[in-house]
Regions:
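Cytosolic, long alpha-helical scaffolding segments
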Residues: 5-188
Length: 188
């Protein structure tokens, strides 16, 4: 909704952005609390396997917080685009929707992995496939963005805002894959 700003009121857009900022701040605090707790646990008498598990959990917590950072960065890019009254073409909106659908698919897969009590190494493969789709789509959109600017389909600055959102969505996919890798490493 925040991306397609044509029909949305400014109050709604500000409220949505404020909510994203609020949850990112909560995520920051949770990361610190969890990391502090795990660090205290690691200072105790643990086997080398226990210490390795703590290291993996710290990595997962950090990557989950990076997902929140990425969502906040994406919201900030959208806010900046809206403040400068940049409006995306229907094709750009469609492409953003497609990219967000891929990142949502990656997030759903991550949640599936987090819920599983037992995993095998091959459980990571669908996440790699989704990440490859995200990377390939981002690369394709970068090429088309340059072509569309050259063909005067939209202004250069509109293309910058557009690629900021696409690039941040791709980073979000990276962080999601990192969480999946850490969780699978811990559970197998």
């Amino acid at each position: 909704d925040l991306v397609r700003s044509r029909g949305l009121g400014d109050v709604y857009k500000r409220q949505t952005y404020s909510r994203v900022e609020k949850y990112e701040s909560i995520s920051d605090r949770m990361e610190i609390e969890i990391a502090n707790y795990l660090t205290c646990v690691a200072e105790g008498r643990l086997s080398s396997e226990g210490k390795e598990e703590i290291r993996i959990m710290l990595r997962a917590v950090s990557e989950i917080e990076s997902i929140a950072d990425s969502c906040n960065n994406m919201a900030r890019s959208i806010k900046r685009r809206n403040e400068f009254k940049s409006i995306f073409t229907d094709e750009q909106n469609h492409n953003v929707d497609q990219m967000l659908a891929l990142t949502e698919k990656a997030l759903h897969r991550m949640i599936e992995i987090l819920k599983k009590s037992e995993l095998v190494r091959d459980d990571v493969n669908p996440s790699y496939n989704i990440e490859n789709e995200i990377n390939n789509y981002r690369n394709q959109l970068k090429i088309h963005n340059v072509e569309d600017i050259n063909n005067k389909k939209y202004q250069y600055q509109d293309g910058v805002y557009y690629m900021d959102i696409i690039g941040e969505a791709e980073k979000l996919g990276d962080y999601v894959l990192n969480v999946v890798q850490a969780v699978i490493e811990k559970k197998i």
